[in-house]
Amino acid sequence: MKEWKEILENKITAELREQIDIFETQIELKRMGKVDDQLFAETRLRKGVYGQRYDNGQRHDGNEVQELNFPSGELLKGPETVWDAPGMLRIKIPFGSLKPEQMRVLADLSEEYADGVLHITTRQDFQYHYIHIDDNPTIMRRLAAVGITTHEACGNVIRNVTACPIAGVCHDENFDVS
């Protein structure tokens, strides 16, 4: 069976390839301590990469708090966000429209890197939970190969606007948003 790189890598646009390569370099620079926590947090958020603070080295098992051993020790990926703590990746789906090939890749990535659940957002986007920071560039490349990006999927940017699919012709709408 062919690996994803053999099938999809030549389909990534030069612009997306460069953006992902730069982000991967920023991850390495952060790991080496050459990028400030706050700056890296802003950088990763623009790429749809969230740190999940609730899991910073501790997990409550229902009876007591358990300490989790993270191999990277005290390295942070943002203020108060441990490097190895599971994160979340938001995926931008303009117009909420997907092709079958894109759905296959989204499903495969959910099984391979997340908890097997592809979360649908109120803004017609998707989220993967329990993603390790180091896996994000590979996930981004696979998404880019089918025309999907995480760029500006979060933060103070314009995202999908959700409206009624029959706006303008719906007889009981309060106002026409079309």
What is each PLM-predicted segment?
Residues 62-63, 86-178:
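Small-residue-enriched alpha-helical segments and adjacent helix-cap loops
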Residues 1-89, 105:
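Iron-sulfur (Fe-S) cluster-binding modules
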